[in-house]
Amino acid sequence: LVIADSGQAGQTKRAVAQVAQLAQDRPDQVMKTMAAIGECTIQAQQAIRQGDLVALGRLMTYNHYYLNQLKVSTPELDSIVKSAWLAGALGAKLTGGGLGGCVIALASQAQQAEAISQAMRQAGAGRTWTMAI
């Protein structure tokens, strides 16, 4: 795993308020998106149990897309996520309450994790950490 700090403090309270407003404005869209996030979570649990890192990475990527649809991502987080993908991450997504905070990326091996870490820093991450799982 590679974890990157965006340098932006997360804004959970604001993110929750934005999603609540979006749910009032576009209830069908928000319900579909929330259902898709729930399905990603179930499938991610299965991928973890089966040791399927490729599927887990794909689901992380989908999850980030859905979080972006809920408007809890930021251009800075999106840039860090994109840099991880381009550097070969199996998947990447924001983590935490949204509107700042950290990004988590999944690498298939240690060398790749270092390349992903460098790419994330070049994309604006203040600090990165790698962790074997």
Residue positions per predicted region:
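C-terminal nucleotide
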Residues: 1-93, 104-133
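Conserved glycine-rich beta-strand-loop-beta hairpin in the small C-terminal domain of fold type I
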Residues: 101
